[in-house]
Amino acid sequence: MATTTPERVMQETMDYHALNAMLNLYDKAGHIQFDKDQQAIDAFFATHVRPHSVTFASQHERLGTLVREGYYDDAVLARYDRAFVLRLFEHAHASGFRFQTFLGAWKFYTSYTLKTFDGKRYLEHFEDRVTMVALTLAQGDETLATQLTDEMLSGRFQPATPTFLNCGKQQRGELVSCFLLRIEDNMESIGRAVNSALQLSKRGGGVAFLLSNLREAGAPIKRIENQSSGVIPVMKMLEDAFSYANQLGARQGAGAVYLHAHHPDILRFLDTKRENADEKIRIKTLSLGVVIPDITFRLAKENAQMALFSPYDIQRRYGKPFGDIAISERYDELIADPHVRKTYINARDFFQTLAEIQFESGYPYIMFEDTVNRANPIAGRINMSNLCSEILQVNSASRYDDNLDYTHIGHDISCNLGSLNIAHVMDSPDIGRTVETAIRGLTAVSDMSHIRSVPSIAAGNAASHAIGLGQMNLHGYLAREGIAYGSPEALDFTNLYFYTITWHAVHTSMRLARERGKTFAGFAQSRYASGDYFTQYLQDDWQPKTAKVRALFARSGITLPTREMWLKLRDDVMRYGIYNQNLQAVPPTGSISYINHATSSIHPIVAKIEIRKEGKTGRVYYPAPFMTNENLDMYQDAYDIGPEKIIDTYAEATRHVDQGLSLTLFFPDTATTRDINKAQIYAWRKGIKSLYYIRLRQLALEGTEIEGCVSCAL
C-alpha cells in the first residue's frame, strides 16, 4: 500500500503560485528548488489553462470560427492556400514547444494570447500565436512563413510586444513599437504634438518628443520680451495626454521628452523629477532624457562655466532649430555672437544636479550627442532618442499653416523591434538564415505600417524602412558556457557575436534592395554608398583573442566574416544599396525575455531568482536561464558586477550596432552621486551612445518595479 508523505500532500494542495514561490525558498539541503517551478507550470496548465481554453473539433473548424466571429483577420489567411495554413499549424503543434518557466507561461496567457471578447477563455496556445504572427509577416510567402514559425518556436527570434500581440487579429493595435517626434518652436507644432501623443498612444506605442527647439522661459513672443513659458507647460500637456490615452484600456500611454543640456530651461526641466518638486511643475509619469555633447564634459573637466543658448535667438540668427545645431562644433562661435542670448551655470554643478535627480528618480536618460553623430552612417543629425534610449535615427522638421495642415511633411521616426536570443542563435543550424529571417520579418512590419493619423511618422517610415534587431540572453549564454560576465572572454565573445550579426544583417538588407530595386531614401548620401561604413571591418583584425571564444564559434559551426566577405559585401552594397536605413538597436527586453526564458537584453541578471511584481497577482518568481545549483557562481548580479564591466560589455557591442543599446547602470545601496558621475564619464569615454535608467540596490523594495515602455521593453 502506497504511503502519502506530508510533503506530497502539501504539494498536491498547493496552487501554481505557491509552487512558483517555492523558488525563493531553499530546501533542507540549502538548494534552490527548481523542480517546484516545473511543477507550477504543470499545475498552471492542468488547473487553469486547459479548463479555460476553448476547444474545437479541428484546426479547420477553429480558423473558420475565429474568422467568422471577428477574432482573426481573414485577409491574412486568404493570402495562402488553406491546406498550407493547416499544415503550418500542424507543424507548429508538432514542434514539442514547452515553456521553461512558470513566469513565461503565465506572461503569455495573461498578456499575449487571444481571448474571448469577455476575456474569460483562451482561443490560442503559444504555437497558434506564433503561426499567426508568421503568416501575417510573411504576407503570402510560404517559405518565409515556415522559417519565421521555426525561428520563433525555437526561441531564436522574438518580435516585440506590439507585433507579437497584434499580428493576425481583426481587432488590434499597430504592429509598431515606438515613435519619436520633433516639436518645433510654434503653437501649430505644439498642438500637433499633443494630438500625436493621443493618436499614437491609443495605438499602443511609446512616444518620445524633442523639446530642444522650444524657446526658453522668458524668451520673446512676437518680439515682446519675457512672454514665453518655456518647456514645462508643454511637458504638462503631454503628460496629461498620455494619461488620458491607452490601448483598449490595457495600459496607460507612455511618453518621454528630451532636452539639450545647453537649453536655458535645463535645470527647471530636471527639477520636475525632484521628490519635493512643487506640484505645479512636478512631472510624475513622463520619462526625461538629456542630450549631452562633448563640450559639456570638457567644460566640467576644466571646472568652467557652461553657456546655455537661447533657441529663439539661434533660430533667428542661424535659420536652424536648436536641435539641428552641433553645439560642440559651434560653441565658441555662439559664445562670441552678441545676438545670441546666453546664461551660465557651472558645468560640474550641472553634472552634480543630474546625478542627484537620478539618485531620486532613476531619470533622466542620457544621449551622448557627439558620440551618436560620429557613429551615424546616415546623412542628417540625430538629436534625440526614444522611451528606452536605444533608437537613434535622423529626423527632419515639418511645417504647418494656421489650420494645422501640413505645408511640408518632415520625417519623424518609428521603429520596428524584435530580438534574437543569443544562446539559441549560437545553437542555430544556420545563423545566416536566422538573421535573414529576422530582418525580413521586421522589414515586413515596416512595410505594413502606415500611421496615417501622424503623416510625418508615415513619411519617415516610408522613406527609411528602419528596423531595430535586438539581442537578449547574453548573461544566460555566458553562464551556460562557464564564462563570467565582463571577463576578457565575455568581452571577446560580445565583440565577435555582434560583428557576425552585423555582416548578416547588412547582407540581408542588401539582398532586399537588390530584389526590390529600391533603397532607403538618402542612401546615396550615406556612408554605405561611399563605402566608408566598411572601413573598420577592412582595416582591423576581427578574430577571437581567446581560445575559449574561438572554440565556441567552432563548436557552433559559425564562420566569422572574413576580410574578403566584407570586401564583397561593400562592393555589393555600393552597387545595389541597402533597403533599411537602420538595422540594429538593442532594447531592454522585458516580458518577451521571460517567455523566451532569456536574461534581459545584454546586461547582467538583477538576481538569481528575480522577483516580479505583477499587478494584482502579486509576486512571481523567475529563475535565471541555464542556472543550476552547481553553477550559481556564474550568476553574479548586476549590482555586484558594477557599472564598469557592464559599460565594457556594451562598448564591445556598440562598435557594431548602428543605433543604440538600452544600458541601465546598477549601483549598490552605498553609492553616491560621485559614483554615478564617474560611471557617466567612463561610459562617455568608452564610446557608449546612451544611458537608460540608474538603478540603486534597495533591498526593501525588491519585487517592485518602475514601469517603462512595454513596447520597447518587448
From Swiss-Prot:
Q: Which reaction does it catalyse?
A: a 2'-deoxyribonucleoside 5'-diphosphate + [thioredoxin]-disulfide + H2O = a ribonucleoside 5'-diphosphate + [thioredoxin]-dithiol
Tell me which residues are marked as the site Important for hydrogen atom transfer: 178, 415
GO terms (molecular function) for this protein are: ATP binding; ribonucleoside-diphosphate reductase activity, thioredoxin disulfide as acceptor
Q: Entry's Pfam families?
A: Ribonuc_red_lgC, Ribonuc_red_lgN, RNR_N
Q: Which residues bind substrate?
A: 161, 177-178, 206, 386-390, 588-592
* One CC-aspect GO term: ribonucleoside-diphosphate reductase complex
List the protein's name.
Ribonucleoside-diphosphate reductase 2 subunit alpha
The gene it comes from is nrdE
